[in-house]
Amino acid sequence: MHTSREPDRRARRNSIHAGAERRAAPDRAAALGQYRARAAVYDFEISSVEPMRRRAIERLGLSAGEVVIDAGCGTGLSLIALARAVGESGAVIGVEQSPEMIRRARDRIAAARLHNVTLVNAPGEEAEIPRTADALLFHFTHDLMQIEAAVARLMAAVRPGGRVVATGLKWAPWWMPATNLFVRAAALRSVTTLAGLDYPWRNLTPYLAGMVVEAGYGGGTYLAYGTRK
C-alpha cells in the first residue's frame, strides 16, 4: 500500500503560512524550522533578486582593509563579494542563526579559500561580534530587522560614520494589488511574520543619518541606506 506524504507536507506549509499572517513578531523556532527545510533550495529560490544583492554591496562602498558585517548571511551568497571588496587586509563577519544555512556558508567560503571571513552561528540579538565594523548589510532579513534587540546589538558593532544598507520585501501602495500578491507569496516562504512589511526599515531609523529609501520591483522591494550616527 502506497501512502503519500504530500498532504502532510502541505499541512505543514499551510500551518507556517497561517502563523506568519497571525504573528505580530518574529518566531525563532518557526524560523529555524523554515530555514531547515529551505536550506537545500535557498540559493535557487532567491536567485531572482541577485541584482538587488549586487546593488546593496556596491552601495556599501567597501574599501580594502575594512570590516563588514553580513547580518543574516544565510548560505553565504554575499560573502565572497564582500570578502573580495575588503581584501585580505579586511574582514567579513557573517551572522546566521540557522545551523543548516550557516553550514552551507562554511562550505562556500572553504571552496573559495577565503581566510578573511568569520561566521557567527547565533541569533542577531545574541551574536558576539568580534570587531568594530565599518559597514553592515541586511539583505532580505525581514524577521531579523523586526527584532529591536537584534538591530541594537548589530548597530552597536558599527562605528560612527559606518555605512548601513538594507534590502528586502515591502508592501506596495494599495493601488498595486498584483505587486502585493507577489510580496505576500514571497514573504510567506521566507518570514515568520508579515508585520512590519509596510515599513520594514523602521528599527534602523534611530541609528542612521541621511537615510534614503529607494523602491524597486514595482514598489514591492526596497533598498535603504544611511550612515551610523
Segments and roles (model prediction):
Residues E125-L136:
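A short acidic, Gly/Pro-enriched loop at the edge of an enzyme's catalytic core
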Residues I69-A71, T75-E126:
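Class I SAM-dependent methyltransferase SAM/SAH-binding core
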Residues R22, V165-Y217:
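C-terminal alpha-helical "lid/dimerization" subdomain adjacent to the S-adenosyl-L-methionine
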Residues A150-P160:
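A short glycine-rich, Lys/Arg-flanked "PGG" loop and its adjoining helix->strand segment in the class I
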Residues A135-E148:
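A short SAM/SAH-binding and catalytic strip from SAM-dependent methyltransferases
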Residues A224-K229:
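C-terminal lobe and adjacent flexible extensions of AdoMet/dcAdoMet transferase-like proteins
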Residues H2-G61, R104, N180-V183, A187:
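Conserved class I S-adenosyl-L-methionine
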Residues G87, M145-Q146, V158-R159:
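Helix-to-beta-strand junctions that scaffold the AdoMet/dcAdoMet cofactor pocket
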